[in-house]
């Protein structure tokens, strides 16, 4: 059984913990309690292949931003979360993606851009088109989710497993360390 390390990144209050807890336990956290760092494990079967996800739910506050390099270094897949009802959280996600690329020294890191809180459609500040365009620019999948309603939560974690499986394939895009030798 494959084991993968998934890191969930985003600003404070975007729903990183709510998404993770909804996926792992099937329950929604109503009260906002800022996270420093939480670690979860869950077995998941994607495309008939069992895997174990080690999910690191990170702090969204700048006070703990210095710890991000270590999270990124150890992570294999990244879920970048912003809140659909907070334009600033959408802007804040861009330097986080840049940090992943800087630490990994590779542009094709398995990641998914996620607009959370789709249940608050009437308060939306970030359009679907804006999220989709940014994901296309980054060449990564894009999803809108709701931890509260469990909308696309399981699909999100299944998709990051697919991204990591693809990256791990010998004929997949292996990045900086792949080489072709002709003798």
Swiss-Prot record:
Q: InterPro entries recorded for this chain?
A: P-loop_NTPase (IPR027417), Rap2 (IPR041840), Small_GTP-bd (IPR005225), Small_GTPase (IPR001806), Small_GTPase_Ras-type (IPR020849)
Binding positions for GTP?
10-17, 57-61, 116-119
**Pro-peptide region(s):** 181-183
Protein's cellular compartments:
Midbody; Cell projection, Lamellipodium membrane; Golgi apparatus; Recycling endosome membrane
SMART domains xrefs: RAB, RAS, RHO
- According to Swiss-Prot or TrEMBL, what is its membrane topology? Lipid-anchor
| NCBIfam families, A to Z | small_GTP (TIGR00231)
- Protein name per its UniProtKB record: Ras-related protein Rap-2a
- State the organism named in the record: Sus scrofa (Pig)
